[in-house]
């Protein structure tokens, strides 16, 4: 094996912005070994942002990481980030109620957890809608661990040229 499976040091504290093939833009901050923050800039749930989501992180290659989680909404997500080829693969399992009314979760989830759970419990859950898609990394930066400033507002409050207006260096090649 060319890598140490338990060494997440090249991944923790990183922030990623990526565009799915459908044109949706997502942002992921790996806050620590068990927690992420994320923001959905565009797509069917554009406007959604979440802090302190508990996740499972695995290193599956020298520069390949898997992040998996289940949300209070009933959504399950599995992301594979390939930091050598600058590719993300996402598998998102949306319960039917989100597909039918995605605007219900286009908010700051942390302020609405009981409501998200009530929506989930009311359903319908099935048939689940699976989105299995590739994305291209467009921005990567090192923000350090547990930085509450990385994702601290909805996407609607970001500058028009975000993320390219950031003072942080983009770690992806030009």
UniProtKB/Swiss-Prot annotation:
It comes from the Bacteria. SUPFAM superfamilies: Lipocalins (SSF50814). The keyword Lyase applies. Its EC number is 4.1.1.-. The keyword Lyase applies. It is an enzyme of class 4 (lyase). Keywords: Decarboxylase, Lyase. One of its GO terms (molecular function) is carboxy-lyase activity. Belongs to the PadC family. PANTHER family: PHENOLIC ACID DECARBOXYLASE PADC. Catalyzes the decarboxylation of phenolic acids. This is Probable phenolic acid decarboxylase.
